[in-house]
């Protein structure tokens, strides 16, 4: 995939990958063997008919390819950019046995971008079936559920807590990985289908789940409110100035443009930044810090590179952009001056012991190996949990001890007519898994309402 030069892109927020040309897309699509048993489809959480859309691309029929994709996915331009295809559809590609797998994700992105560039494309709005469904949260789970239900004729309203629709797609994923204009285009397409989007609506505070159903006539509610409550390490110094959760750091950077001189919510311009964690969010935070002008940015992770949960592509991009990896190290204290600003982070070196419950080798401290990392800002990226607000205001809604909503395989919660999916159920996971949950719940909601009204 053509990309910006690392030493150029680490100073701007423009998209890293520039995408396929028509000629390259057709050439790549022609590598597909069109296998009869279609293993790639089984590797896709939303079950896109991958060989079918690739066949259309190979023949130069990009409109036909989009029609195939859109039957299964409401967010193809998003998926083509941020889904971990290398561990899903592309990992099942027969081509990958002896050579590189077909670039399924890149082809999906190409098709979606081609479609979005057309000015004469009209969305066919289905006839209303007279039933109302509320969606709480406008992230990938909520938008997917909304799109599938709208296509079935439902009157769908999405309630978003922030001032812009998109959820984690706009506040969590940086512009250089997923341009906000792409997300807005996907949201606009849903609006053309008839989906209503209400922003600045915190469900659980402005309105409750019960009020949506009892007072506003929604026959079912889907909760896709994500997992935006950050976790911390509970070590000394986490309350110092210059310590951010990755959630706050990325939201300020991506959504509020806090790095601009005229920002009403400014963010600290640090010279040396430590990002604690090894997932995709940690990579995003580190790469943002570099673009914000930090001279040195460190990823501090307590395991080895082999155990990094981030996508390999994101790790490689971070390395190319000059991010320094301090592996097998764990913070024990954040240090500050008398004005309570960060001056450093004390770490201890680790070694890997026996595997833990996750199957990864457990990191063990090496006694006497403490050292101080010279930094003036720290970003904590060790995971998130669902916000407890909906749980606290919805009687009879069962949740896990850690806060996740309990739902069955179809997304049904302990409350009749109330469904949930995505990070609100699983904890922080991938965009495509959230989309799969939204899709499954949409089918279940449709069945529930249709059976209820027989």
Which positions does each model-derived feature cover?
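Feature captures the FAD/FMN-dependent oxidoreductase FAD-binding
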Residues: 127, 132-136, 184-235, 333-342, ...
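Rossmann-like dinucleotide-binding cores of NAD(P)H-dependent redox enzymes
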Residues: 155-158, 162-192, 197, 286-333
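N-terminal Rossmann-like FAD-binding beta1-loop-alpha1 element of flavoenzymes
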Residues: 131-157, 282-290
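A conserved FAD-binding loop/helix module that cradles the flavin
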Residues: 424-452
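Local cysteine-cluster metal-coordination motifs and their immediate loop/turn environment
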Residues: 30-49, 74-97
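FAD-site-proximal beta/loop scaffold in flavoenzymes
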Residues: 239-270, 355-428
């Amino acid at each position: 995939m053509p990309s910006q030069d690392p030493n150029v892109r680490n100073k701007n927020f423009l998209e890293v990958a520039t995408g396929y040309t028509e000629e390259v897309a057709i050439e790549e699509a022609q590598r597909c063997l069109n296998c009869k048993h279609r293993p790639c489809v089984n590797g896709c959480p939303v079950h896109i008919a991958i060989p079918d859309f690739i066949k259309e691309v190979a023949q130069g029929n990009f409109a036909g390819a989009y029609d195939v994709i859109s039957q299964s996915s409401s967010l193809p331009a998003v998926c083509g950019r941020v889904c971990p295809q290398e561990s899903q559809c592309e990992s099942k590609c027969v081509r990958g046995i002896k050579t590189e797998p077909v670039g399924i994700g890149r082809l999906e992105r190409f098709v979606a971008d081609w479609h979005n560039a057309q000015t004469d494309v009209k969305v066919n709005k289905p006839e209303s079936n007279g039933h109302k469904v509320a969606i709480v949260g406008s992230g990938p789970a909520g938008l997917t559920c909304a799109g599938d239900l709208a296509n079935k004729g439902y009157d769908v309203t999405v309630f978003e807590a922030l001032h812009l629709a998109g959820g984690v797609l706009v506040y969590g994923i940086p512009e250089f990985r997923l341009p906000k204009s792409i997300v807005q285009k996907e949201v606009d397409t849903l609006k053309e289908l008839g989906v209503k989007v209400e922003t600045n609506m915190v469900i659980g505070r402005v309105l409750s789940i019960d009020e949506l159903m009892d007072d506003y006539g929604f026959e079912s509610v889907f909760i896709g409110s994500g997992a935006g409550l950050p976790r911390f390490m509970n070590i000394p110094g986490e309350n110092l100035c210059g310590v951010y959760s990755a959630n706050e750091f990325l939201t300020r950077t991506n959504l509020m443009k806090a790095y601009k001189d005229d920002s009403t919510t400014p963010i600290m311009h640090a010279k040396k930044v430590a990002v604690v964690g090894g997932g995709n969010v940690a990579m995003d935070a580190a790469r943002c810090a570099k673009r914000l002008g930090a001279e040195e940015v460190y990823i501090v992770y307590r395991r080895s590179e082999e155990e990094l949960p981030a996508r390999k592509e994101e790790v490689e991009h971070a390395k190319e952009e000059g991010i320094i990896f301090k592996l097998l190290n764990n913070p024990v204290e954040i240090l500050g001056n008398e004005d309570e600003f960060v001056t450093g982070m004390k770490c201890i070196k680790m070694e890997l012991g026996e595997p833990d419950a996750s199957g990864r080798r457990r990191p063990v401290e090496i006694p006497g190996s403490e050292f101080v990392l010279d930094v003036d800002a720290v970003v904590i990226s060790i995971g998130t949990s669902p916000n407890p607000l909906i749980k606290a205001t919805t009687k009879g809604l069962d949740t896990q001890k850690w806060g996740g909503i309990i739902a069955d395989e179809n997304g049904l919660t302990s409350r009749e007519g109330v469904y949930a999916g995505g990070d609100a159920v699983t904890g922080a996971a991938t965009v495509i898994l959230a989309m799969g949950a939204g899709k499954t719940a949409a089918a279940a909601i449709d069945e529930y309402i249709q059976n209820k009204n027989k």
